[in-house]
């Protein structure tokens, strides 16, 4: 598949989705002004009410798409409860979108530790100081907590909190969308029955 075919939207010859996603993400990294790895994460609460928020993709391979968070946050609690989630990437500069959904699994402690240690020191302090998604009485209270944990971890490495780790979304469907004139867009969806199954490709009406 040539770069020109991808740019014009003629990407329907792809036999599996992960290589195609990797190519699109690399092009987004060259064209998007901010955060080409930004993605909308959708979950549902115990009442079935949906929630969506922007997060950052921190890795992907044939096992799935990985993001990290506080497990006590709203998204963390909801993914732990349902073990399902959906993602939507939109790269406006490229006029492309990728949607996927599937079951969720927790990454290994080794993966979580490695990523946590790669974060800036201030971000690691923040993981301890922020009671994510819970009411905050004032900005001062947050800054005070940051100062306390900064002093506590003034020397040495900052360990990963037990409540902070990563989720891997193992897609059962991945849809690639490319804008075309007159709203006659190209849509190709890859589907499978299980997270380890083979892919079936379907071209969709726009």
From Swiss-Prot:
GO terms for molecular function: FMN binding; pyridoxamine phosphate oxidase activity. One of its GO terms (biological process) is pyridoxine biosynthetic process. It catalyses: pyridoxamine 5'-phosphate + O2 + H2O = pyridoxal 5'-phosphate + H2O2 + NH4(+); pyridoxine 5'-phosphate + O2 = pyridoxal 5'-phosphate + H2O2. Pathway: Cofactor metabolism; pyridoxal 5'-phosphate salvage; pyridoxal 5'-phosphate from pyridoxamine 5'-phosphate: step 1/1; Cofactor metabolism; pyridoxal 5'-phosphate salvage; pyridoxal 5'-phosphate from pyridoxine 5'-phosphate: step 1/1. Its cofactor is FMN. It comes from the Bacteria. Gene3D superfamilies: Electron Transport, Fmn-binding Protein, Chain A (2.30.110.10). Substrate binds at residues 58, 115, 119, 123, 183-185. Binds 1 FMN per subunit. PANTHER family: PYRIDOXINE-5'-PHOSPHATE OXIDASE, PYRIDOXINE-5-PHOSPHATE OXIDASE. Homodimer. This is Pyridoxine/pyridoxamine 5'-phosphate oxidase.
């Amino acid at each position: 598949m040539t770069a020109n075919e991808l740019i014009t939207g003629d990407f329907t010859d792809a036999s599996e989705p992960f290589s195609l996603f990797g190519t699109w993400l690399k092009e987004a990294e060259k064209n998007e002004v901010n955060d080409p790895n930004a993605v909308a994460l959708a979950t549902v609460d115990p009442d079935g009410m949906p929630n969506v928020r922007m997060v950052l993709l921190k890795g992907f391979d044939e096992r799935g798409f990985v993001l990290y968070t506080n497990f006590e946050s709203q998204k963390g609690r909801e993914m732990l409860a349902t073990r399902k989630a959906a993602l939507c990437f939109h790269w406006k500069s490229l006029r492309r979108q990728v949607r996927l959904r599937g079951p969720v699994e927790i990454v290994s402690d080794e993966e979580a530790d490695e990523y946590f240690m790669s974060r800036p020191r201030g971000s690691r302090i923040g993981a301890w100081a922020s009671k994510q998604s819970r009411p905050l009485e004032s900005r001062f209270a947050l800054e005070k907590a940051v100062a306390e944990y900064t002093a506590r971890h003034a020397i040495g490495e900052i360990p990963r909190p037990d409540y902070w780790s990563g989720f891997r979304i193992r897609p059962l469907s991945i849809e690639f969308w490319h804008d075309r004139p007159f709203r006659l867009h190209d849509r190709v969806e890859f589907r499978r029955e299980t997270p380890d199954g083979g892919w079936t490709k379907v071209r969709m009406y726009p």
